[in-house]
């Protein structure tokens, strides 16, 4: 597992920042998986966050790990992917999502990763650790 993935797991909840025209929007997320060294996330196709990312794919994910008082900034460009293996992995790790994303509800899970990305772990003393991304 990558340091990025481990940090997101330790934090539990992370925050995804998008833009709605000139208005920043931030919301908590928790769904993520790693496959082949890349981190993948998911949102619903029926949500504003999805429409915002389609319109402006530049986003930032921030996670805070309270035990160490460090935080992660993961910034990049959203790229939506169609990956049955990643989708199945998400459903295995978060089975409750099957109740939301299925033929009966009509809702679709949109899986994305970040490209042209940077990731840093920072602390209150000003230390910055640049993470290597795949």
Identify what each model region corresponds to.
Residues 32-68:
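A short mixed-secondary-structure module that forms the rim of ligand-binding clefts
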Residues 73-134:
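Charged, gly/pro-rich active-site loop segments
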Residues 11, 56, 94:
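Acidic-histidine catalytic/liganding microenvironments
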């Amino acid at each position: 597992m990558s340091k990025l993935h481990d940090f997101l797991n330790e934090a539990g909840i992370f925050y995804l920042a998008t833009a709605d025209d000139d208005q920043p929007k931030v919301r908590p997320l928790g769904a993520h998986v790693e496959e082949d060294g890349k981190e993948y996330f998911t949102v619903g196709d029926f949500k504003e966050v999805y429409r915002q990312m389609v319109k402006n794919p530049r986003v930032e994910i921030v996670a805070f790990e309270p035990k160490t008082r460090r935080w992660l900034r993961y910034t990049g460009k959203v790229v939506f992917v169609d990956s049955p293996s990643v989708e199945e992995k998400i459903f295995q790790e978060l089975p409750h999502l099957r109740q939301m994303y299925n033929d009966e509800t009509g809702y679709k899970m949109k899986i994305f990763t970040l490209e042209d990305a940077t990731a840093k772990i920072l602390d209150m003393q000003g230390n910055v650790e640049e993470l290597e991304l795949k």
